[in-house]
């Protein structure tokens, strides 16, 4: 639908100095933390995806005081020791926490070996992550981790 000369698609974007538009995420993917601030998970997930230890990731944090990354260990790292994987992803979290806004900082990571798929209900037929499914599966644990991380002022990793 066109309103005020704009086509409303549900996408968020940024415009550079030359007038080019870049899609930065979907409005419906944003969530509000306990501080009442909105987090755009897509750019954070994209940066986290640079870590070779993970192949799928989803940032959760609706109503939490810290965000938590849920990540699937990459097939190439499945035989690596867990402590090596944890050290790598927590290093990535620490680096990202240094550049994201304060309310978007992560308190930790939930790691799993089970890939997300259409068959297990986590991906859509177009291979997009169903964020509500991630929240249903990992939300309670993520909420507890967010509280623990905020209280202890440390990064936490858990396996599932």
Question: What is each residue range found by the language model?
Answer:
Residues 1-2, 31:
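Short clusters of hydrophobic/aromatic residues that line enzyme substrate/ligand-binding pockets
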Residues 9, 33-34, 124-126:
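Ser/Thr-glycine-rich phosphate-binding loops at phosphate-binding pockets of nucleotides
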């Amino acid at each position: 639908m066109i309103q005020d000369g704009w086509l409303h698609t549900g996408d968020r974007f940024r415009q550079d100095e030359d007038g080019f538009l870049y899609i930065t995420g979907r409005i419906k993917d944003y969530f509000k933390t306990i501080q009442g601030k909105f987090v755009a998970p897509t750019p954070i997930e994209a940066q986290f995806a640079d870590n070779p230890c993970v192949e799928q990731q989803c940032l959760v944090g609706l109503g939490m005081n810290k965000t938590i990354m849920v990540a699937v260990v990459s097939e190439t790292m499945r035989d690596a020791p867990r402590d090596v994987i944890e050290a790598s992803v927590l290093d990535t979290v620490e680096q990202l926490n240094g550049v994201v806004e304060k309310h978007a900082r992560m308190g930790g990571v939930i790691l799993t070996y089970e890939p997300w798929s259409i068959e297990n209900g986590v991906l859509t037929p177009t291979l997009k992550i169903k964020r509500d499914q991630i929240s249903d599966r990992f939300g309670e644990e993520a909420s507890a981790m967010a509280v623990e991380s905020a209280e202890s002022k440390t990064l936490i990793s858990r396996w599932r």
